[in-house]
């Protein structure tokens, strides 16, 4: 999804900001496919997430055939910082501590993780390795807004819902990973 999320959409069970947006021109950083349409090209980060025919794949590669497959099958694809590759921590240049989020694959189970406290990217990735995660990539953390609906139907919001108000304008290419009810 690109653009502001409809907070009243009851079909959404999870959403979080996905790809980074360039500060200089508002473009999406790295390769990005939305419902089969390429919206950005390039390799800025080696981590990727693809959703094609209802199958989510998280991985790390310079070149992935899933970008092309997403364009051919009306799928989705985006790039982000890699955190874990084949159960091995991937070092990244990002420094400092922040709330961290990631999308992970552990033995074929896809799930999202968020830290409860500000952490370094290294410590976050190490925790994922310690949890037995096979593959993981970063999702935009810090104040980026999103929500999840648990099995009882309770909504859990994270980030700052009012971040893009006043003088701060949401970049037009702000993208979200969205999971919906079947």
What are these model-derived regions, one by one?
Residues 1-182:
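Gly/Ser/Thr/Pro-rich low-complexity, intrinsically disordered segments
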């Amino acid at each position: 999804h690109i653009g502001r999320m409809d907070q009243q959409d009851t079909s959404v069970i999870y959403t979080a900001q996905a790809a980074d947006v360039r500060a200089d021109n508002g473009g999406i950083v790295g390769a990005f496919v939305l419902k089969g349409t390429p919206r950005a090209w390039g390799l800025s980060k080696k981590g990727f997430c693809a959703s094609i025919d209802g199958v989510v794949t998280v991985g790390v590669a310079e070149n992935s055939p899933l970008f092309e497959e997403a364009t051919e099958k009306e799928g989705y694809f985006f790039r982000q910082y890699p955190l874990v590759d084949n159960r091995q921590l991937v070092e990244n240049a990002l420094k400092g501590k922040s709330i961290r989020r990631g999308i992970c694959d552990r033995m074929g189970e896809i799930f999202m993780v968020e830290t409860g406290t500000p952490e370094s990217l290294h410590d976050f990735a190490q925790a994922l390795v310690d949890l037995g995660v096979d593959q993981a990539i970063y999702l935009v953390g810090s104040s980026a807004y999103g929500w999840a609906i648990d099995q009882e139907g309770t909504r859990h919001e994270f980030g700052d819902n009012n971040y893009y108000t006043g003088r701060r304008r949401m970049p037009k290419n702000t993208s979200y990973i969205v999971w919906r009810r079947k």
